[in-house]
Every structure is written in structure tokens, then in C-alpha cells.
Swiss-Prot record:
This is Sex-regulated protein janus-B. One of its GO terms (cellular component) is cytosol. Signal peptide: none annotated. Substrate binds at residues 42, 110-112.
Amino acid sequence: MKMFQSLSLLPRIVSPFRKCYSTDLISLVGVPRVKITKGQNRYLLVNIHTHGFTKYGRVIVRGADVENHLTIFDSILEELEPQGICAKILGGGRILNETDSKKMKIYGTSRTFGSADHTRTRNILQSWTTYKDFKITVKN
């Protein structure tokens, strides 16, 4: 009888693990942390998450040579919404990406979304294997 009582607890034990290893979380981890182009870019610092599955989100950087930050946000939504991932903008700015000389400069603000934490952006870029050897300067 005690064995059956112990087995009745099994769904409560397994449920959190099933939630942690669901396909929604795998798709969140599968989103690249950094996507920026060469040259001068506008960029957004974005917190992504899935409702009901994750307690904390993942912060990503997206940048492109476009007219305004809203265009970048639209492309982020096109990329993430089909996967069921939500995006919250933390701020924006500009990145001067000189890939030939392995230098980057992060500066400025977004008129639409406000200023991003440029130091946090630098840390994310340096953790990415493509940009770990770059000299990244931040100007607030």
C-alpha cells in the first residue's frame, strides 16, 4: 500500500522536468544570442521568453543597418512569434562593427525604445564566439 502511495507522488515529481524539457524551451535556447551586420548598425537589446514555461527570459542582441529601431523590432517579431516566443525590448542604441580591425563601438540611444544597457550588450557580444577577440568600447 505504501508503494502505491509513493507512486501517486510521481506525477508531481516528473511534471517540472517535463516542463523544463519541453519543445518550447528548446526553441528558446535555439535562438541565437547575437545577430548584427557589418558597419554602422542600430541595435536592440531584447529579453525573450515563453509564457507559462520559463521563469526567466534570455537576453539577445539584434542589429541591422535600417532607418529606425522599429524595423528591427518587426523583424524580431517575424522571427520569434511563429515559435511562440515573446519579446520585450530593454532598449536600443548603435553599434559600429568594424570586423576588419576587430573593433566595435557601442553608443547612442533609441528614440522609440530608450537607451539600452551598453555594458550588458558588450558582455553578451564578448560571450559570443564570433566577437570574443574584438575590442569593444562603450560610450554612454
